[in-house]
């Protein structure tokens, strides 16, 4: 009974042990997996080492770049400090000039004030002269007797002197008339010249405004033509793009139909499709990164353009403010001219008034002469007239001397003007030479700029051609690799795709060449326009030179005219100074125009750089479109291949199911369910991935369209801004030196910032790529390991579950049918074990195949990683090449900066030279003015001393007269005061005095009545107290509040030692009623009623109300009572008593 069962169990458990024992195949697989992991680890370590080397090299290069950038920053800061120092020096110099001008103006004001004082002094002298006449007439009466004999002898001499004096007066009058005529002629000439100059200036401003408007119209027409040509180009490019898209879609449809026919032959390409999907994902990620980088670059460029626009707008506002300031300065200058003209008119009026006064003086002199002829007998009058004539003779001699000195000064001024004329001629010649040199330098710079631009564009063409060739070679290599990998499956398909790609490339190359040719033509047109603008500027400068020469000739004519008239010397000096300032202004304008041409050249260079950047962006966009199209083709092919492979797999699985349905109904049901689940999950995952890719592609398309629209709008905005900038720059061309320096600084800062941002972006991209590759590699390895482990564990668990189910079923059946079916079960069990072993071996073989496939996938992935690393290295090389190009550009910028610094130094030297010359002229002018002022001051001091002495004498006389007048006035004042004090009183005052006296008497009577009433009440109280003491006399201390206290002696009268709450009224009235009785009892303490002077032994008489006024006071008080008023302190004591 036991033997067959045991044998069956041994056989069963032996089979199970054999089933679950570690087979040699699994051991081999485990060893293979270990070898695989070690090899992968070594490869990854090598790759990491290579990447660390690359990173170290990049870090060293970055350090070198940072050191170079620091050096550039230091140099830039030094240049900024130098420029700031120069600007400070310029500001100080301008401030010194302003202070000098202010000092000159102050001196002019002081001179004008001195002239006014001199006129006032003359008027005072005339008044004093008239007073002196009167005094002399008074003195003549006293000196008649003394000068009788002398006058007879001197009469003849006086007649001779009179004739001479009259002749001198006539000559002096003729000279004055001549001087006035000369002055009038000179003033008229100056006014006519000033009007002509103003008319010429107005004409020149009108011509300049007309030329500026014409230039603006031409620029606007050119800009419109450019905008129209660009719009046409855009429309042509859009049409070509649509055509290319349609052709490409037709080709894609043909290729898709061709590939759908050949999909039946492509069965084992699922792994390759997975790899291609991963590659496409990576490419998409790379494209996204590149696209984000391009977006960031575009945003930065837009921000820079916005900042530049704001800078230009600020500059335009500052220029407008400066224009307004200049207009206000012109208005102020015109007002000053009007004021000066008014002053001239006032001076003329003053001269006319002086002439009228002179005529009046002459008429007075004629009257005096008539008096002398009439009063020949009066010798005293003749003597006085002789003194007058001598004084006038002295004054006229002094005036003649002054006129001679003025003649000498005028001659000196003429010599100075001749010297200034020669200096101006030399200066104009030097300016002509400098302008010619500047024009030659400008021509040289323009030629050099043309050459540099031509070389730069040739280099860019060569670089673009090399880049295109490199890209073509890269694409050819990529296509060759794909052909080698897919040659055993679909040679014909790859050849067709390659041929289509080559055709597309050729078309794109043709399009790019056409675009490049168009860009070349546009650049040549811009060059021609610049040449025309330079020629126009040359013509304008030549016109300005001609006008300057004409003005110099006009000034020479004016100088010749000024030599003829003496009085117009100061006007000519002013006109020469104005002409000098105009010439300086014209020189500044020519310098500004030269700077404007330089700025225009810089703007054109910036525009060329922008067009180059746009060209590069279009090329990059076309490349991205090519990549996207290739990726789409690959993606579509992969999708179709995956669908065909799924169909084939499903067919094979159905055939296998049909073959093994009879044998694997119970054992393989669970395996099939698990496989179905895995299939569904894989299908869902693949479908999700495909949908995600399609969504990403649609989003990328939308983003591209949005970016195209944004770029178009930004282009339009930039064009509009460009037109605005041109208009503003044509209108505001005066003060651009500081703006140029600011732009230079801002460009340097922007360049430094862009360089830093580029370096930071490069570092970030490198780090991101390294992290991404490491993470991706680790994730893929872990996913492969986890998938392998999960598949093995699931397979083991499934087999255990199947064995357990079979064991339980067999045990149940064995218990029921042990005896009858044991032999049959043994045979069936053996057959089932054979079948299970066979299935197990097949499954192991399938697992081995899957492992081999996973190993192949990992190897292919490692190859792809190697390719990726090579691509990254190539990208690094490309970026290094780009960095070297940037270094070259930085060197070029440094060269430009050095050239600009040289130009600035040359201009600074010129400014210093002009400044030194102007300082010399100012010093000479100041010396001349000082000499003149010294001479004038000497004359003024002499006159002042004379007049001072005369005024002192007059002042002393007037002081004596004033003292006499003061004495007489004081005597009269004293008499008037005495009369005022001794005057009679008014009746109204007398009435008021009587009324007041009556009021005082009434008041005194009332006070007396009150005092008497008070005394009456006091006596009544005293009588009451005495009567009380008589009745109660047995107590030792009568009338005291404290009865236990000792009784004081009668003679002791010291009420001051006790405390009194209320003051005693009787005590205060010590000189009151009666003779004072010493035998009286002491009063009650603190009683204000009892008086010590009353007699205590005798009773007082009965109080009787007073019928009339009683005299209880002393005689002194009785005398003072009618006048004195009641005491306020006493009234207070009354109030305290009654309140107590």
UniProtKB/Swiss-Prot annotation:
<protein>
    <recommendedName>
        <fullName>Protein FAM184A</fullName>
    </recommendedName>
</protein>
<keyword id="KW-0175">Coiled coil</keyword>
<feature type="region of interest" description="Disordered">
    <location>
        <begin position="1063"/>
        <end position="1128"/>
    </location>
</feature>
<feature type="coiled-coil region">
    <location>
        <begin position="868"/>
        <end position="907"/>
    </location>
</feature>
<comment type="similarity">
    <text>Belongs to the FAM184 family.</text>
</comment>
<keyword id="KW-0963">Cytoplasm</keyword>
<dbReference type="GO" id="GO:0005829">
    <property type="term" value="C:cytosol"/>
</dbReference>
<feature type="coiled-coil region">
    <location>
        <begin position="296"/>
        <end position="800"/>
    </location>
</feature>
<keyword id="KW-0206">Cytoskeleton</keyword>
<dbReference type="GO" id="GO:0005615">
    <property type="term" value="C:extracellular space"/>
</dbReference>
<dbReference type="GO" id="GO:0036064">
    <property type="term" value="C:ciliary basal body"/>
</dbReference>
<dbReference type="GO" id="GO:0034451">
    <property type="term" value="C:centriolar satellite"/>
</dbReference>
<dbReference type="GO" id="GO:0043231">
    <property type="term" value="C:intracellular membrane-bounded organelle"/>
</dbReference>
<feature type="coiled-coil region">
    <location>
        <begin position="57"/>
        <end position="256"/>
    </location>
</feature>
<dbReference type="Pfam" id="PF15665">
    <property type="entry name" value="FAM184"/>
</dbReference>
<dbReference type="GO" id="GO:0000932">
    <property type="term" value="C:P-body"/>
</dbReference>
<dbReference type="InterPro" id="IPR039478">
    <property type="entry name" value="FAM184A/B_N"/>
</dbReference>
């Amino acid at each position: 009974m036991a033997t067959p069962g045991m044998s069956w169990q041994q056989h069963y458990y032996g089979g199970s042990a054999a089933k679950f024992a570690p087979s040699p195949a699994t051991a081999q697989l485990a060893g293979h997996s270990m070898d695989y992991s070690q090899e992968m680890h070594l490869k990854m370590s090598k790759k990491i080492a290579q990447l660390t080397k690359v990173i170290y090299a990049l870090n060293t290069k970055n350090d070198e770049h940072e050191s170079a950038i620091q050096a550039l920053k230091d140099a830039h800061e030094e240049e900024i400090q130098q420029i700031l120092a120069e600007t400070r020096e310029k500001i100080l110099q301008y401030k010194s000039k302003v202070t000098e001008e202010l000092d000159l103006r102050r001196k002019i004001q002081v001179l004008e004030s001195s002239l006014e004082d001199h006129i006032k002094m003359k008027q005072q002298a005339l008044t004093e002269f008239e007073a002196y006449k009167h005094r002399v007439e008074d003195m003549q009466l006293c000196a008649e007797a003394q000068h009788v004999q002398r006058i007879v002898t001197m009469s003849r001499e006086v007649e001779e002197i009179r004739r001479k004096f009259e002749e001198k007066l006539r000559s002096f009058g003729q000279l004055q008339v001549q001087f006035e005529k000369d002055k009038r002629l000179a003033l008229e000439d100056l006014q006519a010249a000033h009007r002509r100059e103003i008319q010429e200036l107005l004409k020149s401003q009108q011509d300049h405004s007309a030329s500026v408007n014409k230039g603006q119209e031409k620029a606007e027409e050119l800009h419109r033509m450019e905008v129209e040509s660009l719009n046409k180009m855009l429309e042509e490019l859009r049409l070509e793009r649509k055509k290319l898209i349609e052709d490409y879609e037709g080709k894609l449809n043909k290729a898709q139909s061709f590939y759908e026919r050949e999909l039946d032959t492509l069965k084992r390409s699922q792994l390759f499709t997975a790899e291609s999907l991963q590659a496409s994902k990576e490419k998409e990620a790379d494209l996204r990164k590149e696209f984000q980088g391009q977006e960031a670059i575009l945003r930065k460029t837009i921000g820079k353009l916005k900042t530049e626009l704001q800078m230009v707008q600020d500059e335009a506002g500052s220029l407008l403010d400066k224009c307004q300031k200049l207009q206000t300065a012109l208005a102020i200058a015109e007002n000053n001219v009007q004021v000066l003209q008014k002053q001239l008119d006032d001076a003329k009026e003053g001269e006319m008034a002086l002439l009228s006064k002179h005529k009046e003086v002459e008429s007075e002199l004629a009257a005096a002469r008539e008096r002398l002829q009439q009063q020949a007998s009066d010798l005293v009058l003749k003597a006085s007239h002789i003194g007058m004539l001598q004084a006038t003779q002295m004054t006229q001699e002094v005036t003649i001397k002054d006129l001679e000195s003025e003649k000498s000064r005028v001659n000196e001024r003429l010599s100075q003007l001749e010297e200034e004329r020669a200096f101006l001629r030399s200066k104009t010649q030097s300016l002509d030479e400098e302008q010619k040199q500047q024009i030659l330098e400008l021509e040289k710079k323009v030629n050099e700029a043309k050459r540099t631009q031509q070389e730069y564009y040739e280099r860019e063409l060569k670089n673009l051609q090399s880049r295109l060739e490199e890209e073509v070679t890269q694409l050819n290599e990529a296509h060759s690799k794909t052909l080698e990998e897919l040659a055993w499956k679909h040679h014909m398909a790859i050849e067709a795709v390659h041929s289509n790609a080559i055709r597309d490339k050729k078309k794109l190359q043709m399009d790019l060449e056409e675009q490049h040719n168009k860009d070349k033509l546009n650049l040549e047109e811009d060059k021609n326009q610049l040449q025309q603008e330079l020629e126009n500027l040359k013509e304008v400068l030549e016109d300005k030179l001609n006008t300057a020469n004409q003005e110099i000739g006009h000034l020479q004519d004016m100088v010749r005219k000024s030599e003829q008239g003496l009085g117009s010397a100061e006007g000519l000096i002013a006109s020469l100074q104005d002409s000098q300032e105009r010439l300086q202004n014209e020189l500044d304008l020519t310098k500004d125009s030269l700077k404007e041409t330089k700025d225009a050249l810089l703007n054109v260079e910036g525009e060329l750089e922008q067009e180059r950047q746009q060209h590069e962006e279009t090329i990059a966009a076309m490349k991205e479109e090519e990549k996207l199209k290739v990726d789409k083709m690959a993606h579509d092919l992969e999708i179709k291949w995956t669908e065909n492979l799924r169909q084939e797999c499903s067919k094979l699985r159905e055939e296998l199911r049909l073959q093994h349905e009879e044998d694997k109904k119970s054992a393989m049901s669970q395996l099939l369910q698990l496989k179905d689940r895995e299939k569904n999950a894989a299908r869902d995952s693949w479908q999700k991935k495909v949908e995600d890719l399609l969504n990403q592609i649609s989003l990328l398309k939308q983003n591209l369209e949005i970016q195209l629209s944004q770029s178009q709008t930004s282009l339009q905005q930039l064009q509009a801004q460009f037109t605005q900038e041109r208009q503003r720059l044509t209108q505001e061309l005066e003060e651009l030196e500081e703006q140029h320096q600011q732009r230079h600084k801002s460009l340097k800062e922007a360049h430094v910032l862009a360089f830093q941002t580029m370096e930071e972006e490069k570092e970030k991209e490198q780090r991101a790529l390294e992290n991404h590759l490491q993470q991706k590699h680790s994730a893929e390895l872990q996913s492969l390991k986890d998938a392998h482990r999960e598949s093995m564990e699931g397979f083991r668990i499934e087999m255990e579950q199947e064995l357990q189910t079979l064991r339980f079923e067999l045990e149940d059946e064995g218990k029921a049918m042990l005896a009858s079916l044991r032999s049959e079960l043994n045979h069936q069990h053996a057959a089932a074990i054979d079948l299970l072993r066979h299935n197990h071996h097949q499954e192991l073989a399938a697992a081995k195949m899957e492992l081999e496939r996973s190993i192949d996938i990992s190897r292919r992935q490692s190859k792809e990683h190697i390719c990726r690393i090579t691509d990254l290295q190539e990208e690094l090389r490309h970026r290094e090449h780009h960095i070297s190009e940037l270094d070259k550009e930085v060197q070029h910028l440094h060269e430009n900066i050095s050239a600009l610094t040289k130009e600035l130094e040359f201009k600074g030297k010129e400014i210093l030279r002009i400044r030194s010359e102007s300082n010399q002229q100012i010093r000479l002018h100041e010396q001349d003015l000082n000499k003149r002022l010294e001479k004038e001051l000497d004359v003024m001091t002499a006159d002042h001393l004379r007049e001072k002495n005369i005024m002192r004498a007059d002042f002393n006389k007037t002081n004596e007269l004033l003292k006499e007048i003061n004495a007489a006035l004081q005597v009269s004042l004293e008499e008037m005061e005495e009369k005022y004090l001794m005057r009679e009183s008014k009746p109204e005052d007398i009435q008021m005095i009587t009324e007041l006296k009556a009021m005082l008497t009434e008041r005194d009577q009332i006070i007396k009545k009150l005092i008497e009433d008070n005394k009456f009440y006091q006596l009544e109280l005293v009588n009451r107290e005495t009567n009380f003491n008589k009745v109660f006399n047995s107590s030792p201390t009568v009338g005291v509040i404290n009865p236990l206290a000792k009784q004081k002696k009668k003679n002791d009268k010291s009420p001051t030692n006790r405390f009194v709450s209320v003051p005693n009224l009787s005590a205060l009235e010590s000189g009151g009623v009666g003779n004072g009785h010493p035998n009286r009892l002491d009063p009650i303490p603190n009683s204000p009623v009892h008086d010590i002077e009353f007699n205590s032994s005798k009773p007082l008489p009965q109080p009787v109300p007073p019928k009339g006024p009683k005299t209880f006071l002393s005689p002194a008080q009785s005398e003072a009572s009618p006048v004195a008023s009641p005491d306020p302190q006493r009234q207070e004591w009354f109030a305290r008593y009654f309140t107590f």
